[in-house]
């Protein structure tokens, strides 16, 4: 089997906050699969892409990881937990390994990270919902792409199903 070696310019790192892109911490596997399809189209995910998906709760991680497929899952509990976990995953000289970084979130916490990468010659793209893009992040990057608005879906729980007589 032949090994394909990609140059730094061809390699991409995607840091994806699933909860931010869906607009809710309550989601189903079907919602995550639909998000991935849309995300890959909007971000123009390349063949040499590494994807890291983050959540802010361990209870969401398994659903997101299994539904997304092929991505490295990370989490940190609490407010901004997914953001912190994703920043930690991208904090190892990415400018030396990747020609493009895609941030799947509109949160302001990524603004300094994105601006620093651009100064180092890395192409940075932000993919987010229009209503979730922070002004600071918008000013920090040259390429912002919007997901189409979707309605968040809550997981179905037994009490929501009703009774059959």
Q: Residue spans of the language-model regions?
A:
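Nuclease catalytic cores that cleave nucleic-acid phosphodiester bonds
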Residues: 57-165
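Domain-level signal for Mg2+-assisted phosphodiester chemistry and nucleotide/NA-binding surfaces
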Residues: 1-82, 123
């Amino acid at each position: 089997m032949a090994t394909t070696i990609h140059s730094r310019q061809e390699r991409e790192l995607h840091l994806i906050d699933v909860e931010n892109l869906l607009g809710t911490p309550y989601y189903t596997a079907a919602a995550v699969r639909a998000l991935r399809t849309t995300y890959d189209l909007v971000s123009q995910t390349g063949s040499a892409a590494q994807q890291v998906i983050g959540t802010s709760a361990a209870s969401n991680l398994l659903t997101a990881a299994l539904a997304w497929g092929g991505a490295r899952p990370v989490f940190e509990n609490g407010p901004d937990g997914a953001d912190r976990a994703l920043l930690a995953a991208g904090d190892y000289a990415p400018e030396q390994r990747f020609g493009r970084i895609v941030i799947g979130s509109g949160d302001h916490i990524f603004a300094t990270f994105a601006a620093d990468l651009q100064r180092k010659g890395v192409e940075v793209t932000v993919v987010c919902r229009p209503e979730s893009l922070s002004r600071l992040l918008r000013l920090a990057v040259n390429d912002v792409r919007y997901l189409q608005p979707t309605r968040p879906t809550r997981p179905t729980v037994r009490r929501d199903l009703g009774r059959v007589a």
